[in-house]
């Protein structure tokens, strides 16, 4: 359309998506009730969705030249996938932390969960050092595949993880 949209304009998307998708995913768990997946499966699914974000971002770099202007919908869908993954992982992680912790240490375990997210963000800042102009496809592909593989491992071993956490006897 010949319009230019600043990068800063997209900074509100994750917050808007988080509010909307948090409500949608929370409603999904309410509707599913006792049929909902175990917490590790939710985290595995969410992690795979996180990985789908970078995998999706390989597409515009494969379809268009690096100097080409592309639709802003690419970044919108990228954010949508990332935040949908977060809607699966974040609340479930906080719930698990409070469920598996001894009652006297629930707050500390919730803090440890928060610190794990900070650690992930710190690792991301290290991963950015591997980015070189012109290497967008391999960069996003590696990050996406590693993240999806981690989610798949959590899904495969979900029941064992839940049993190890003592969550097969407890409900979320």
PLM features: residue spans?
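Transmembrane alpha-helices of Major Facilitator/SLC transporters
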Residues: 3-33, 46-54
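Transmembrane alpha-helical cores of Major Facilitator Superfamily
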Residues: 12, 16, 48, 80, ...
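Cytoplasmic loop-to-transmembrane helix junctions
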Residues: 38, 45, 70, 74-77, ...
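C-terminal ends and interior cores of transmembrane alpha-helices
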Residues: 45-67
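Hydrophobic core of transmembrane alpha-helices in multi-pass small-molecule transporters
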Residues: 66-88
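Intracellular juxtamembrane helix-capping segments at the cytosolic ends
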Residues: 87-102
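A late C-terminal transmembrane helix in Major Facilitator Superfamily
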Residues: 98-132
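Symmetry-related core transmembrane helices of the 12-TM Major Facilitator Superfamily/SLC fold
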Residues: 137-159
